[in-house]
Each structure stands twice: as C-alpha cells, then as structure tokens.
C-alpha cells in the first residue's frame, strides 16, 4: 500500500479504472481519496496544466461527483453566513433598546429633579449648561409643547436676557444687539427685558445712555417693548415721587430723559416731569429737576425752545424766592451756566450711541396722568398653549430683523456642488461685477452737512487760536475752502464777532484785510451784509450791535462798496425795530470813524444816488418825512437836506400841475370850483408858527416845511423831529383861498388870493357883501425862500384895498385905501375863526429860525355886483384885509 501511494501520478488514472472494474479494491481506493484529497486535487491540477503528459479528459462520472460535492460545500457556507448576520443584528437591536431605556430613565430622573428644584421660589439650584442643554434636547424630542420644556426655555430666556443686558457697553453694543434678537424670544420675554434693564440702570447710572440706545434699537423693530418700558418707568416715577424715594426717582427720571433724547418717548413727558418737580419746590425736587434738565436740556432747546425758556424762567423764580438751600441755589446757577455754554458736556446723544435714524424711530406719547398698565404678569412663567406656533412666528420675525435667508444658503450649497469650469466662470463673473456693485454701494449722499459743520469748526478754531488779525487771515487763507463756500468763511467771521460781549476791532480788521486782498472777498462780504440785514431781527441786541459795528467798519474803510446799502429801505413799512437799531449803530460807527462832515460829503456822491433811493426816499412824502425824522433823531439830520428841499418843492410842483389842469377850463365857474379843489388838495389847515404862512389860507411858499433847526449858517440840527402835522396843517378859517407865490433873489413877488367872506348881516340871512382887496409889494431876499430872507432886508410895500359892499338899503359902496405895511411884519389875513395868535402858540410846536424879515403882497378880488354901486374911498379896516404882524 505504501508503494501505491508513492506511485507517480501518471498511473493513478489506470489504477482507478481497474479498481472500478474490480470490486474488492473499491474500498481501499475510497479510503485513499479521503485521506489525501489535497494530493488528488493537486494531481488533477497538474494534469490539467500539463496536457502533454495526459491528453485524455477525465471520465464523466468523476466530473459529476466533483461538481455535486462543490455545490454542497457552497450551500453550507451560505447558510452559516446568514446565521451569523442574523445573530449580529439581534445583538445590536438589544443593545440599542438597552441604551434607549437607559437614556429615558436618565431623562425622567432629570425632569423630576428639575421639577422639584424649580418649584422653589428662587428658581432652583444651579444646573450645568451641558446638562441643561441635554435635558432641553431630550424634552424637545419628547414633546416641544410640554410644560417642562416651556419652563426650561423660560429659564434659559431669562438668563440670556439678563446676561446680555449686564454685558452691554459702548464698545460692544453693536454685537450685543444681534445676540439679543437671535438668542432670545424678546416678544415672550419683553417683561424680563424691561425688568432686567431697569435694574441694571438703577445700579449703574453712568451706563444710562447705553441702555437707552439699546432700547431705542429694540424699539425700532419691536415697538411694544419700548412702550412697555416707558409705561413701567412712568409708573415707577409716580410711585417714587409719592413715597419721597429720592434715589429711585432720580434714576427713573434720568432714564426717561435719555429715552426722550432717543425719541422713544415724546418731549411732552419731560416737560410734565419738570413742571411737577418745580410746582412745589423743595431741595430734593429741585435737585432732581436740575439733573433731569442737564440731561434733556439740549434736546428741549432744539425741539421746544419756548417751553424750555419757560422752564428756565421757573428755575430763575425759584432761585429768587430763596426758599431752597444754598447748595441747590448754586446748582441752579451752574445749570444756567451750562445752558449758556450750549450743554457741551451733556449732548443729546453721544456720537458712539447715535445708531438709529430719526425717521426709523417710533415715539410713544405717554402722560403722567394716563391710566397705565404695567403688565406685571409678563415677569413670571405661564404656560403657553400655542407655544410651538409662537416660536415659529418669532423665528420668521427674527429672520426679517437679522436678514437671515435660507435661499442664500441653498444657493451657496448649489454653487459648491457645481463643476469646476462653471464655478470658475461664475467666479470670474462675480469678480468682474464685484467692484461695480461695491462702488454702487459706496455712493453715499451726505445730507447731514457734516463737511460744512467740520469746515465751520475749523474756521472757528483757527480764529480763536490766533493772536492777531494778521495771523488769523494768514491761517484762513491756507485753508482749502471748497468752491462755492466762500460765503461760509465770511459768515463765520461775522458770527464770531457777534458772540463777543463787546465789539472787538480784531474782527473788523480781519474783514477789512480780506476785502482788500481780493475782489471776491469784497463781493462776498457785501452779499453777507445783505443776508444779515434781511435776518437781523433774529439776533438779540448785543449780537446785533456787534454785527452793525463790524459792517460799519467795513463801510467806513471802503472795504465793501457803499452801493450795498441799496438793500436798506427807510420807511415805516419795510423796516423793523431791529433793522432801525442796526442802521443806527452802523451809521454811528461810520460817523465815529469818518466824522460828520466827511460822512455827509460821502453821501453826496452823485454816482451812488440811485443806490441810496431807498435810504433817502424822494418818491413819497410820507417816506421822506419818516426818513427825515429817523436820521434827525439819531443825530444825522445833516444828511436830510436834500429831502427837506424836496418837501419844499413838492407842493409847488403839485400846485403847478393842478393850475395847468384848471387853466384848460378857462371859465369863472371853473376857476371858483378849482380854487376850492386846490385849497382842499393843498391842505388849508395850518397850525405852524412860521411867519411866512397866512392864517386865512394855506400858502405853499418856500417856507412851508417846518425845520427843527437853530440857524441856517451853523447847519446844526436839533433832535426835534420833522413835524408832518405842521406841513399838512390847515387853517381853521372858513375862507377858501388860492395862492401863488413866487420868490426870486432881489426881485418883486406878487401873491394873488381870492376870498369870499360873508358879512355879519349875511350870517343872519339879511344882507350880502362882496369885497376885493388888492395889495402888492416888492422885497429883496437873499435866498430863494421868503422864510429864509435876511432879517434886515429892505422892503417897501403898498397895500391897496378896493371893496364893493352892498348896503342895507340896497345901494352899493366902493372904497379904496392905501396903507403902508410896517417893516419886519408879515401879512396876516383875518377870518372869522379864533385868534390866530393863540392858535399859533398852541398848535405850532416847531419854530423855524431860518426866516428873517418876511413880507407878503396879497391881492384879493371879489366879483362886482351886477346892480349899480357907490364908490367910496376910505381908510378902513375890513375883515378881508390882511394886517401884518411881527
């Protein structure tokens, strides 16, 4: 047998065939196969690999047995693999169930523990954040609307809000706001927010502007929170005021003041608080009011100036009453000083906290007398049956506030999943469009005039830091003033000048130097003069005086053209009290620097008369009289000579025009009618004391205007104003007169007057009389006015009276008389009115010293009767005669 086993593989096939034929050897062969299967397989593989040794294929029966054996082995291996997999799955399922049960048991234990701890008043013991987070995740997975989860979310909300409020500062407020909106449901926790921020503000008053700014930002998105905070603060202020709790009242008032500055609360509430505190002043109430006013004073000065002035008047009254302590009185004085400085140390809103646009802010109108609901129930936990819906609603609101957009995230993920080429193309496109988009975003339109404010600040600091005007001009010329803003430099110089307590020549010399350096500065200052004259009524007296003296210096030094005075219209309609004071101070400054004589000569410049028509009007007698009175009252009557001459000649021109119109009619009736018209138009009611006027009629002679002067030679004008009453006065006589006067140097003048005077019998309705008187004289005068003739003029006059009168019997009488007129006496016509001497002394306040010896030659004619008459000549004194008086 061993030899058979060592036989070569080539004889195996033969022996197997022989064994098949001989049955006794079959068992031995099978035993051999079982003991060495590997060898048989290797022999088969060897025979298959080397066909040269054995070229005949194996028998069919052998192949069948081998394939069936292989099938049985593979089926057994598959069954064992499936069994192993099933066993593994069952084991994993058991482990997972065990873990789930363990987690549920732990969660139930934690929930029970949390419920027991949270049942206490203090809110329970400290739970580590990791454990609390796991607990909340477990509760949310189990039931998001459960009471346990709502309680845990409420505690987390309270801790989040309190932590963020305590952490906020000027430096990190911009990062705290997104966390506040994103990490907490402020709509649900608005009561917690108000309570936390009120507590934090009461403990740290210096952070009140920060808390107010944070509330202002929240109020723009969630106005209900700002309103609730304002309501609670007002309620707390009322309670503390009634309880005399000074600390709480002071902190609450300060918080409300900053909310008013941020426009969260209307300024009416601030005024009501001030009125309440100052209604019955005590040391504590006045102290709180002073602190409140320092915080809100800058805002009230801009928004409610009238109410602010009334509050300071009340402060002043409290100070003068003296019912408060010295310390509080000193606080009021310090507050007044702070107000004069413009609240520099207490601005409305610090620059770092000015984070809300004025148009975006929502202002709440709350009064101290309103019925307020502070909603204390929002401070404690309550189960919300719609908790899940409210949370989803707040998520959408948070997305709108913070700008979160799921589409953008989706777009970003899709962009990441794109192919390399498409991503490269899109990146190229974005790179090409990026700078343009950035440039469009950077186009900012500054409508706050920040650059203009900075320019003014620079000019102001430059002026104030200069030792003399030359240094200031040199520094200002180095400034890069933008094109078109040269006027701002001039305005700032004038404003700085007006801010001084008294006028300083520093600013006048500065303006003069600018004007003489370049023509554009002269034109700019001229434009500035026009602007300031139009708005001078807005300035108080001290500032007005400084501005007037500044421009007076510029005019007196010829820095700006005198034609700029064309904006001044000196009449009653176009001037105000401020503008008249401005012109007065400006002209007095010019007079002080130039002198009265030089000033008068400058105003006689012919080329500028057109520009001074508004200053010295000659188009309307009323405006002329107003200008004369004004300049005479300020001591510059010498400037009004031409206007006075105009007033003298104006009636003559008017009378000549009327006479030319009446001469066209050419009839006696028209003459008689026109005489009445002319007498009424020229004003026959005279109350003057001039010796050149006739008491029976108004004669517009050369002495018609009454001057308040002392002497013609000295040209010194008194302060007595021009009397328009004396100019437009009328005689009270009943005679109707028509007069023409002509006066020439060393020539003869004749005056003709017609008068009808009823006799005594005519008054009783019994008789009528007509009289006519003729008189003529010749006089010599030095000037063109009879009222300004020499006091020693030589005059010879003859008076001829020719009258026709109707006697009671129906006959006519005629008389003619000649009588010399006494020297140095002016003719005076009598009428039936009262004694003219008494009336003259009573009605005529202004007496002219211009007139010397005055004479008048009057001729009076009356139409003769149609019937016959008797001619008689006699020296008699009739009512229509005009005797002379001294």
UniProtKB/Swiss-Prot annotation:
Residues 731-755, 791-801, 821-831, 873-886 have a biased composition (Basic residues). Residues 454-570 form the MI domain. Residues 158-342 form the MIF4G domain. GO terms for cellular component: catalytic step 2 spliceosome; cytoplasm. InterPro entries: ARM-type_fold, CWC22_splicing_factor, Initiation_fac_eIF4g_MI, MIF4G-like_typ-3. GO terms for molecular function: RNA binding. This is Pre-mRNA-splicing factor CWC22. The lineage of its organism: Eukaryota, Fungi, Dikarya, Basidiomycota, Ustilaginomycotina.
């Amino acid at each position: 047998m061993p030899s058979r086993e060592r036989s070569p593989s080539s004889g195996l096939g033969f022996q197997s065939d022989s064994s098949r034929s001989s049955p006794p050897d079959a068992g031995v062969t099978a035993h051999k196969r079982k003991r060495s299967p590997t060898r048989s397989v290797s022999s088969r593989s060897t025979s298959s690999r080397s066909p040269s040794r054995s070229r005949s294929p194996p028998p069919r029966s052998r192949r069948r047995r081998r394939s069936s054996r292989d099938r049985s082995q593979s089926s057994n291996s598959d069954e064992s693999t499936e069994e192993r997999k099933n066993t593994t799955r069952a084991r994993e399922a058991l482990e997972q169930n065990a873990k789930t049960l363990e987690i549920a048991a732990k969660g139930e234990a934690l929930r029970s523990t949390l419920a027991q701890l949270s049942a206490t008043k203090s809110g329970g013991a400290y739970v580590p954040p990791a454990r609390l987070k796991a607990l909340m995740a477990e509760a949310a997975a189990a039931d998001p609307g459960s009471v346990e989860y709502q309680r845990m979310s409420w505690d987390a909300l309270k801790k989040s809000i309190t932590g963020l409020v305590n952490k906020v500062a000027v430096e990190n407020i911009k990062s705290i706001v997104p966390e506040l909106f994103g990490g907490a449901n402020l709509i649900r926790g608005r009561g917690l927010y108000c309570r936390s921020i009120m507590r934090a503000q009461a403990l740290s008053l210096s952070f009140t502007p920060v808390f107010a700014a944070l509330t202002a930002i929240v109020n723009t998105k969630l106005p209900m929170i700002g309103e609730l905070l304002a309501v609670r603060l007002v309620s707390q202020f009322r309670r503390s005021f009634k309880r005399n709790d000074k600390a709480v009242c002071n902190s609450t008032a300060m918080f409300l003041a900053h909310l008013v500055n941020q426009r969260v609360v209307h300024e009416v509430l601030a005024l009501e608080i001030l009125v309440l505190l100052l209604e019955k002043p005590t040391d504590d109430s006045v102290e709180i009011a002073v602190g409140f006013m320092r915080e809100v004073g800058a805002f009230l000065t801009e928004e409610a100036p009238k109410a602010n002035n009334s509050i300071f008047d009340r402060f002043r009254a409290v100070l003068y009453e003296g019912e408060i302590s010295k310390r509080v009185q000193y606080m009021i004085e310090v507050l007044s000083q702070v107000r004069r400085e413009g609240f520099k140390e207490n601005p409305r809103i610090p620059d770092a906290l000015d984070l809300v646009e004025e148009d975006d802010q929502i202002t709440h109108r709350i009064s101290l007398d309103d019925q307020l609901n502070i909603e204390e129930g929002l401070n404690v936990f309550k189960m919300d049956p719609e908790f899940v819906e409210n949370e989803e609603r707040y998520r959408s609101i948070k997305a709108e506030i913070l700008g979160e957009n799921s589409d953008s995230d989706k777009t970003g993920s899709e962009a990441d999943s794109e192919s390399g080429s498409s991503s490269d193309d899109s990146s190229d496109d974005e790179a090409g469009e990026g700078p343009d988009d950035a440039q469009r975003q950077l186009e900012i339109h500054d409508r706050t005039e920040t650059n203009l404010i900075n320019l003014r600040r620079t000019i102001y600091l430059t002026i104030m830091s200069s030792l003399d005007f030359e240094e200031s001009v040199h520094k200002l010329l180095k400034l890069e003033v933008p094109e078109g803003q040269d006027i701002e430099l001039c305005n700032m110089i004038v404003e700085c000048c007006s801010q001084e307590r008294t006028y300083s020549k520093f600013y006048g010399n500065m303006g003069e130097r600018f004007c003489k350096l370049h023509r554009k500065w002269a034109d700019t200052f001229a434009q500035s003069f026009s602007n300031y004259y139009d708005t001078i009524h807005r300035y108080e007296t001290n500032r007005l005086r400084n501005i007037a003296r500044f421009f007076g210096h510029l005019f007196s030094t010829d820095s700006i053209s005198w034609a700029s005075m064309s904006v001044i219209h000196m009449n009653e309609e176009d001037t105000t009290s401020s503008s008249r004071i401005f012109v007065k101070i400006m002209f007095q400054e010019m007079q002080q620097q130039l002198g009265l004589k030089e000033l008068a000569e400058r105003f006689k410049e012919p080329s500028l008369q057109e520009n001074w028509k508004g200053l010295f009007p000659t188009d309307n007698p009323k405006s002329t009289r107003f200008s004369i009175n004004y300049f005479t009252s300020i001591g510059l009557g010498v400037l009004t000579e031409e206007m006075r001459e105009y007033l003298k000649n104006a009636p003559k021109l008017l009378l000549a025009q009327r006479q030319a119109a009446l001469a066209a009619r050419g009839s006696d009736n028209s003459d008689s009618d026109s005489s009445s018209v002319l007498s009424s138009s020229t004003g026959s009611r005279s109350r003057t004391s001039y010796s050149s006027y006739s008491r029976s009629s108004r004669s517009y002679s050369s002495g018609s205007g009454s001057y308040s002067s002392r002497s013609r030679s000295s040209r010194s004008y008194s302060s007595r104003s021009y009397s328009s009453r004396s100019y437009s006065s009328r005689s009270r006589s009943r005679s109707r007169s028509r007069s023409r006067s002509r006066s020439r140097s060393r020539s003869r003048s004749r005056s003709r007057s017609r008068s009808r005077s009823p006799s005594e019998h005519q008054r009783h309705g019994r008789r009528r009389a007509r009289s006519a008187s003729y008189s003529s004289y010749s006089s010599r005068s030095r000037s063109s006015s009879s009222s300004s003739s020499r006091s020693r003029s030589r005059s010879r006059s003859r008076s001829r009276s020719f009258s026709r009168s109707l006697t009671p019997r129906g006959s006519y009488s005629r008389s003619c008389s000649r009588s010399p007129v006494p020297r140095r006496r002016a003719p005076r016509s009598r009428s039936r009115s009262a004694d003219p001497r008494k009336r003259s002394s009573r009605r005529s306040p202004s007496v002219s010293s211009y007139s010397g010896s005055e004479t008048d030659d009057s001729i009076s004619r009356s139409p003769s009767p149609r019937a016959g008459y008797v001619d008689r000549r006699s020296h008699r004194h009739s009512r229509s005669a005009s005797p002379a008086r001294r």
